[in-house]
């Protein structure tokens, strides 16, 4: 903004025309689908608006702003094309560099997949140690120490890789590459440790089951009416559930049935007797009367069926359409109001 204020009116006019030409070229590129610098469109719009505000301020101050400036549009368009091509080359180079880095990383991962599992793990650990600083490596060693202490003692009986190589060289036999035999020894150790762990777990499970059997078999005394569950063994998932038998309801006798039937008959007789003839209903203790008599029909009433007087209505409509009312003389004559 400060740079624009320092320029003269001619320079501002020239810059305005150049920025308008560049904006037109960029919009044409966007319409064609090969726009390289979309952010430049907003910048040009803001620049043109600032130039116009400065010119209007100078016009208000009394300076002459009505100056025509000629700009060679061919040069401006050629300049814009060169800038866009250079920008496209830079962007292409950046994209190729990113693709090469990605392919290199994928190639390293493919090499790790080809190697055995133990070698790949060793390589990844080495890379992690190299990438971490010295302060963090001490922390990693401290974390690895308890893990190494938790390993079974069976793994210590096997000789290390270097000892095996030294024994073979002493006997005179050619020493085989260590990378092939190290994983085999580790696999054997892992299998033996797994079998030892399984045996120890089975023994613990048996001891716990034997300790819990007498306690599980003893039945607890429960109050009547509640369900009791007795578990035979800890390992089995089945359980015997004892449900108390429901108490049988007393079967109604013949005398009780007869008494109920008599009571129902008495109630029916009472209801029938309460209803009286003549449209009145009586209930015990109510005495409410309902009059169902209808009003007598008026003998002088005329009956009319819809559409019977259509002829009369037609004649009335015809006479009304033919005859027109004449206006009064008082309303048609113009006068002064004096008689």
Swiss-Prot record:
Signal peptide span: none
Keywords recorded for this protein, A-Z: DNA-binding, Ribonucleoprotein, Ribosomal protein
Bias (Low complexity) ranges: 145-156, 171-182, 217-238
Region of interest (Unknown), ranges: 97-339
Cystine crosslinks: none
Gene Ontology CC annotations of this record: cytosolic large ribosomal subunit
UniProt feature, compositional bias: Basic and acidic residues: 157-170, 185-210, 239-248
Domain of life: Bacteria
Example GO BP: translation
Stretch list, region Large ribosomal subunit protein uL29: 1-96
DNA-binding recorded as keyword: yes
Pfam short name (any one): Ribosomal_L29
Keyword DNA-binding listed: yes
Family listed: Belongs to the universal ribosomal protein uL29 family.
Subunit-level organization: Forms homomultimers. Part of the ribosome; radioactive IRS binds to purified ribosomes.
Function recorded in the entry: Specifically binds a DNA inverted repeat sequence (IRS) found downstream of rpsB in one of the ribosomal subunit operons (for genes rpsB, tsf, and unknown gene x). Might be involved in regulation of transcription of the rpsB operon; the IRS may be a control element to attenuate transcription.
Protein name stated in the entry: Large ribosomal subunit protein uL29
Organism of derivation: Spiroplasma citri
